[in-house]
Amino acid sequence: MKEDAEKSCLWLKREYDSGLIKSWSLDLIQNLPLSGFKEWQDDLKKAITFSPPHLSIYDLNIENGTVFKKLINLGKLKLPSDEEAFSNSESTHLILKNSGYSRYEISNYCLPRHQSRHNRVYWSGLGWWSFGQGSTSSPWGEKFTRPRVSKEYKKWVTRQDEFNLDSSLTNKEFVYKELDEKIMLGLRLKEGVDIKEVFKEQNWENKKFESNFSKLLEEWERFLRSGLLVRKGNRFFLSEPNGMELSNQVLVSMFKWWDEIN
């Protein structure tokens, strides 16, 4: 399988270098069980030799009901500790930075002029279309997922041909995201989010507007002091690499604030 992946990367590099494709991306998963620090570094450096214009680096997410989750519960599989995972992620950032890649979102790196437009649309809270089995679209703010099972997806497509189109294809009334989700999405981007700008959508009276802003600042004060979070005017963004690697701490405090004011 690894050999097939390398052949695919080599083909994509050749097509890109010849100008037949404009860009391509490679997805990698770090902090895997049974994968040590050196093994991951070797894989990452190997990937860089193919010069992919765009790289997405994800951490393994263990879901309930999966084989991995069962093995972990049985003590037969062990994930890296939080300290090991942080060290790995920090090393990943430095290797990619020294190889000419810039980080424009927590999980995404690219060479100049190769930011993913789809990723930027998603993290900016704008709408997008996706097509095919199991795909998720959000053209007007609300997410719609197509059936994941082939049989059910075929039935869904047939209904579109024989009856009226599904409302997810025709409803053009935009559904705005909740404020906490909008802040969370914005903070994932390198440029962060203008808090007072996204506050405006709440139509709060001035006194409530300023009160809620002050309460959020209180929650974030310790992260501003520690350097995980940076403020420039009303714009807040996560520092690199520590803020982005430890973003959950900042986001959890923001969700706590949101629950308290609602």
Where are these regions (language model features)?
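A short, conserved structural fragment
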Residues: 224-234
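Short amphipathic alpha-helical interaction segments
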Residues: 206-224
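Intrinsically disordered or highly flexible coil/loop and linker segments, enriched in small
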Residues: 192-193, 229, 260
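An alpha-helix initiation/capping motif
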Residues: 86, 177, 214, 241-244
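Minor-groove-contacting beta-hairpin "wing" of winged helix-turn-helix DNA-binding domains
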Residues: 235-240
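C-terminal scaffold of the Radical SAM
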Residues: 1-210
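Short, amphipathic alpha-helical interaction segments positioned at domain boundaries
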Residues: 241-262
